[in-house]
Amino acid sequence: MFLFPAIDLKDGACVRLKLGLMEESTVFNTDPGAQARDFAAAGAEWIHVVDLNGAFAGKPVNGAAVDSILKSVSVPVQLGGGIREMATIEDWLARGIRRVILGTVALKNPALVKEACQRFPGRVAVGIDAKGGKVAVEGWAETSDLTVLELARKFEDCGVAALIYTDIDRDGVLAGPNVAATAALADAISIPVIASGGVSSLVDLKALKAYPKLEGVISGRAIYDGRIDVAQAIALLKA
């Protein structure tokens, strides 16, 4: 199982949000490239990056910060936030992003996801963010009537590399991940699932590791708060 240390970008800096609220952000590092280097030095095999401004704007905003991350590390980077068009997907992959994460567009234009998977095999992930079990989009500002499983099943046979499942009600509050919902989703679909939201300790990582269908786990605030040591977490997940 992989650990995906998270870099959430707002106005060019590494921040963490609480419950997905932009006004509830805390700056942890003003140099995203340096943060990425720290993660790579600790043994991270992937880095998870989100363009928060982009998620709300519907187009990339923190391009310079993402480029600084790509220049700073050789480990693969997956990126989400504001990726809504094929031209944007092409651009990010050409710039060195290993895997793009499609969120809002997966709900609003699933055909684009399927086309991207055909054109870029293994380089397209779907991000499903849930609030009360229902899919949330537009930077979590809007909730749909679709359940997580209903949306996930739309992409079962089109070659999606991974499904990143975030429980917004737990994100950035260190309340522990929604292990039951995440495990149930992983059991119900054939796409590898990456858990996100609420991870607060090595105990939480152990709980998720018990489910072999999970490909990995994303952690942000717990790392920045010093509750999780990246090297220790990787050793635990690899053991």
Curated annotation (Swiss-Prot):
Its EC number is 5.3.1.16. Pathway: Amino-acid biosynthesis; L-histidine biosynthesis; L-histidine from 5-phospho-alpha-D-ribose 1-diphosphate: step 4/9. CDD domains: HisA. GO terms for biological process: L-histidine biosynthetic process; L-tryptophan biosynthetic process. GO terms for molecular function: 1-(5-phosphoribosyl)-5-[(5-phosphoribosylamino)methylideneamino]imidazole-4-carboxamide isomerase activity. It is an enzyme of class 5 (isomerase). The active site is at D8, D129. One of its GO terms (cellular component) is cytoplasm. Pfam families: His_biosynth. Keywords: Amino-acid biosynthesis, Cytoplasm, Histidine biosynthesis, Isomerase. NCBIfam families: 1-(5-phosphoribosyl)-5-[(5-phosphoribosylamino)methylideneamino]imidazole-4-carboxamide isomerase. Belongs to the HisA/HisF family. This is 1-(5-phosphoribosyl)-5-[(5-phosphoribosylamino)methylideneamino] imidazole-4-carboxamide isomerase.
